Structures are given as structure tokens and as C-alpha cells.
Amino acid sequence: MITATALGKSLAQYIAPIADQFNQLGIPEPIVHWGHPFFMSIVILAMGSYAGISGWKVRLQKDDASRSAHKRVSLWMTTFLAMGYTGGLLSLVMQGQPLLESPHFWTGTAVLLLLAVNGSLSLFGFGNANVALAGKFRTAHAYLGTAILSLLVFHALLGVRLGLSI
């Protein structure tokens, strides 16, 4: 059976050549250590809160401007979170830390998977010819999105704990 530790070591070996390229740039250690949390906090706080607020405005007030903003910001937020996920793995490899072992890794993975599910709800469910079913998809999307934002806050706290421990 493959363990998380063995899989993490295998993944680290795959990422190591990329990390070596970045290490050759002479990036200061504080940037390598705290760059990922700094930029991800901007994405989570600015884009996450805006996506959540605009999403609930659409739900409660049927605001077309908020609908457009929610779609646009949510898509970019998800893109930046996916890029940050890979950047976080790269940062850990650059610092010689193990992969796939921290709760921060697992909550980040869960966030991306849940964002994919939530995006699928809107993509495949909102245009459903059955209006009642489309409404249920919208309700599930709203509450799942709120749960994802809550998970992101918990994820950030785990990240601070991880950052302070290494």
C-alpha cells in the first residue's frame, strides 16, 4: 500500500527540478517561506469575500450586476487558488519540507475539489429545464460556496500554524 509519506516523497522528486530552478534565482528565504501565505491571504480575503457577498446578493436580491461579478470573480479566485496550491507545494519542496502530510495540504485539496463540485452545480444545474430542480441546484451552490469559504478560513489558520512551525 502506498502511504501519504511515500507518495509525498515521489511527488517531491517530481517537483524538485522546478524547485531547483527557483532556488538558483537566489530568492530570499522570507519570500520563499511567506510568499505563498501572503498572496493566498489576498486571494481568500479579497476575492473570496467578494465572491461570497456577490453570490448571496444574486440569491437574495436577483441583482444582475452581482451575478456577472460573482461569475467573473469566482472563476478567477478558483484559478488563483489552484495556482497557489501548486505554488505552496513548490514552496515546501524549496524549503525541504515533506509533502502531503499536513492538515493544511488536505484542506487545500478539499477546497479545490469542492470548488470543482460547486462550479459543476452552476454549470450543469442552473439551466435545467425543471425549474424546481434548478432552484435546488442554486440552493446547494449557495450553501456549498459558503461552506467552502469557511473551510478556506480554517485552511488559512492551519497554514499560519504550518508556517510558524517550519
Predicted regions and their residues:
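Membrane-embedded alpha-helical bundles that constitute the cytochrome b-like, heme-associated redox core
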Residues: 1-166
